[in-house]
């Protein structure tokens, strides 16, 4: 449940000599904040979807959308507004025009606050045709290894319906690249748990 991702609960366990079966409080804090997780990927030289790497104001979201207009030579590029906290497909809004951003930003912030107790948002370019690939990784705080990949592209409302392991569509070279990226981030964070790193593979430019 939600306690498995609660930083304060993990800290209390640690302070009271109770073994918390899960990530350390530091790792929960790092990966529970998508902006800091994005920054870890950047620092690990793992490619990320173009976006903001910190809590993003409405004005910053508008500026980023304008930069997408310039970089794509399109008046109506696609952008995703996402909650910094949480998951499960909640706190996400697609926008396809500059005029829609203010209203969708407000809705997304409200949903994020209601679901996760944190209204912070960030934005990124929307990859409209993508495969969702996950790499399972396990670490003991020093050493890390992987348990291969699975494809989770069959979704409804950003929530997985079907998982196929291993992915039947990944080329060997790309599979190795994704596994290496997951292991690099796990190693840099001192992973002491079993966790999943999620990747998007752009079908238009895999």
Residue positions per predicted region:
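N-terminal beta-alpha lobe that positions the nucleotide/phosphoryl donor
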Residues: 1-206
């Amino acid at each position: 449940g939600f306690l498995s991702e609660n930083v304060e609960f993990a800290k209390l366990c640690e302070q009271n000599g109770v073994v918390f079966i899960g990530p350390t409080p530091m790792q929960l804090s790092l990966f529970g904040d998508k902006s800091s997780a994005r920054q870890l990927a950047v620092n690990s030289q793992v490619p990320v979807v173009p976006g903001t790497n910190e809590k993003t104001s409405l004005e910053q979201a508008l500026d980023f959308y304008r930069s997408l207009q310039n970089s794509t030579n399109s008046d109506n590029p696609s952008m995703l507004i996402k909650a910094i906290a949480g998951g499960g497909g909640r706190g996400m809004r697609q926008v396809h025009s500059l005029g829609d951003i203010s209203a969708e930003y407000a809705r997304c912030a409200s949903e994020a606050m209601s679901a996760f107790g944190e209204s912070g948002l960030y934005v990124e370019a929307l990859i409209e045709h993508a495969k969702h690939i996950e790499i399972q990784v396990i670490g003991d705080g020093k050493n890390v290894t992987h348990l291969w990949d699975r494809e989770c592209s069959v979704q409804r409302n950003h929530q997985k319906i079907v998982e196929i392991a291993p992915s039947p569509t990944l080329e060997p070279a790309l599979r190795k690249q994704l596994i290496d990226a997951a292991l690099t981030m796990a190693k840099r964070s001192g992973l002491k748990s079993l966790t999943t790193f999620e990747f998007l593979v752009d079908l238009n430019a895999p």
